[in-house]
Amino acid sequence: MSVKKICFAASSGGHYEQLMMLQPLMEEYNSFVVTEKTIYKSSVENKKMYYVSQVNRKEVSFIPRMILNLFKELYIFLKERPDVVITTGVLAIIPLCLFAKLFGKKLIYIESFAKVTSPTETGKLMYKFADRFYVQWGQMLEIYPDAVFLGGIY
């Protein structure tokens, strides 16, 4: 069995912070990170980093930025060829997740720690596509009955 290549992906802010809780796992595998470009430094020691545009669905620039991200993420995906994509969401990372499924790769989605009783919009979409879907609160199993609950990421 060959060593798997893993893409860890998240938008900026809290989603990225949650993803960083998986750093011990990142160190075990050939992996790289995809996140939004921000004014603050986001990096993981000894890991290749890729940056996509920040998106906000309420901004006028939403559609052009998503189109730009679509092409950036396709380039990243084809260049790196990950076997698995692990993500905490959200919007900016959706194209990467869909490319994983389109190319027959595994997709693992971790619903936000902040969502205790209601789903995220991205979570509702990814629940349909993810090979493994994790929730961080037991009560979220009522919303996502086929999800896996192992506790919080923190």
Model-predicted segments: where are they?
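Extreme N-terminal starter segment of soluble prokaryotic enzymes
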Residues: 2-6
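Conserved nucleotide-sugar phosphate-binding/catalytic loop shared by glycosyltransferases and other
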Residues: 10-12, 30-65, 139, 150-153
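Short beta->alpha connector loops
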Residues: 12-15, 37-38, 90-92, 113-117, ...
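Short amphipathic alpha-helix
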Residues: 14-27, 38
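An amphipathic, basic-hydrophobic alpha-helix
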Residues: 60-83, 102
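An aromatic- and histidine-rich active-site surface loop
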Residues: 82-103
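Active-site-proximal region of nucleotide-activated glycan assembly enzymes
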Residues: 105-154
